[in-house]
């Protein structure tokens, strides 16, 4: 059976969902409004743009964010793989170079043959 899924937004969740679906053989249309339109918080055209470098938080398994990341790793999270390539020293937190992380996620998504990126703003569903 052939499936096609539309994902709105190339933030963290949208990119993770698109990559996961594409990895399962699903054709994905990913819509991202940047660089056509920017929100007040976003400055770059890249995907998965983080507002601060430590947005991925603690790695300790006794913390909610650490446990969530461990579960995501076990499920094959592509974004956590990207985070490892952009990692910077931050004690017990998973912190990344924001630009390097966004560039890697953008590269991963744009190079995936099952994902078609549409750089346009979606006004209505």
Where on the chain are the PLM-derived regions?
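Catalytic P-loop NTPase motifs of RecA-like helicase/translocase cores
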Residues: 15, 37-38, 125
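N-terminal FAD cofactor-binding segment of flavoenzymes
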Residues: 19-81
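Fold-independent oxyanion-binding glycine-rich loops
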Residues: 10, 32-33, 120-122
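Conserved active-site and cofactor/substrate-binding residues in soluble primary-metabolism enzymes
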Residues: 12, 16, 63, 67-70, ...
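Feature captures the FAD/FMN-dependent oxidoreductase FAD-binding
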Residues: 71-125
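Beta1/beta-strand and adjacent pyrophosphate-binding region of the FAD-binding site
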Residues: 1-13
């Amino acid at each position: 059976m052939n499936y096609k899924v539309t994902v709105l937004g190339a933030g963290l969740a949208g990119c993770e969902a698109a990559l996961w679906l594409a990895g399962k053989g699903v054709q994905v249309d990913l819509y991202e409004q940047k660089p056509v339109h920017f929100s007040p918080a976003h400055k770059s055209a890249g995907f998965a743009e983080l507002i601060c470098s430590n947005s991925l938080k603690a790695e300790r398994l006794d913390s909610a964010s650490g446990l969530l990341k461990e579960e995501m790793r076990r499920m094959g999270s592509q974004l956590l793989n990207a985070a490892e390539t952009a990692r910077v020293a931050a004690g017990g937190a998973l912190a990344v170079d924001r630009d390097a992380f966004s560039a890697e996620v953008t590269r991963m998504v744009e190079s995936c043959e099952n994902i078609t990126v549409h750089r346009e703003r979606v006004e209505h569903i």
